[in-house]
Amino acid sequence: MEDGPVFYGFKNIFITMFATFFFFKLLIKVFLALLTHFYIVKGNRKEAARIAEEIYGGISDCWADRSPLHEAAAQGRLLALKTLIAQGVNVNLVTINRVSSLHEACLGGHVACAKALLENGAHVNGVTVHGATPLFNACCSGSAACVNVLLEFGAKAQLEVHLASPIHEAVKRGHRECMEILLANNVNIDHEVPQLGTPLYVACTYQRVDCVKKLLELGASVDHGQWLDTPLHAAARQSNVEVIHLLTDYGANLKRRNAQGKSALDLAAPKSSVEQALLLREGPPALSQLCRLCVRKCLGRACHQAIHKLHLPEPLERFLLYQ
């Protein structure tokens, strides 16, 4: 019993020493990170690289902060970029976040700079620490020209699930032309990303009507969204009635329930135009609508092209094509 206080005294000393050591180590990490930033701002690349090596371990030999080549690419200064390349600057220099000059050129939509970099050996599928490729950046900026050039040089149109998806980014921002180019290059129109869902689901979430319409025209599954959440669920949470009409015209199931057991109608704001639109579509569809859906289902995803080959009367053809 007499040793009790001594034991607890030593225990408290040990805990205090451990906590002090932990916070001291954390303070050093923070200090080194701030010092790295200081050297980057001052332009001392070698010292910044050395400090980054200490913090992050095995950094590639091709590491650099935002170099003059990055700046030229980001600002679309083609002559300056070509001059730097001619002087022997490595086109694959990357920042601490693995951002290359090609990433910068594509994010700015500077197709001439992107092409010059690619012609001089830039990695077309380089990935940043955030999982972004140059193609993702091109879709982010909405540069269809950059998207075409990247694909011409071998960019992967559809990437692994853990990487940022170019088509989802294009749809999210309403860049329909970029979306169509990717789909023409065999990207799965119903590709589901765990945190985002399918391209159609994203289009409905962000109310990109043009993208919703085009995806449905090209055969996107009208009920495939994010797990049990359908595109109609996503649209019901928003305020765009046109998206509701498009989805229901293409046969969206109003009775489908999500993981919480809710239908699209349950998610619509009370007494809103979206709720009214869903209520109006709850009844049995017209026979003509059922026939149209049946014909399109039989023709499959390529029905948009197949319908033209049936040589139907123009009014009927236009009806089947939702025109």
UniProtKB/Swiss-Prot annotation:
InterPro entries, A to Z: Ankyrin-SOCS_box_domain, Ankyrin_rpt, Ankyrin_rpt-contain_sf, ASB9/11_SOCS, SOCS_box, SOCS_box-like_dom_sf
Entry's localization field: Endoplasmic reticulum
GO molecular function term, any single one: ubiquitin-like ligase-substrate adaptor activity
Entry keyword set: ANK repeat, Endoplasmic reticulum, Repeat, Ubl conjugation pathway
GO cellular component, one term: endoplasmic reticulum
Keyword Endoplasmic reticulum: yes
Protein name: Ankyrin repeat and SOCS box protein 11
Species whose genome carries this gene: Homo sapiens (Human)
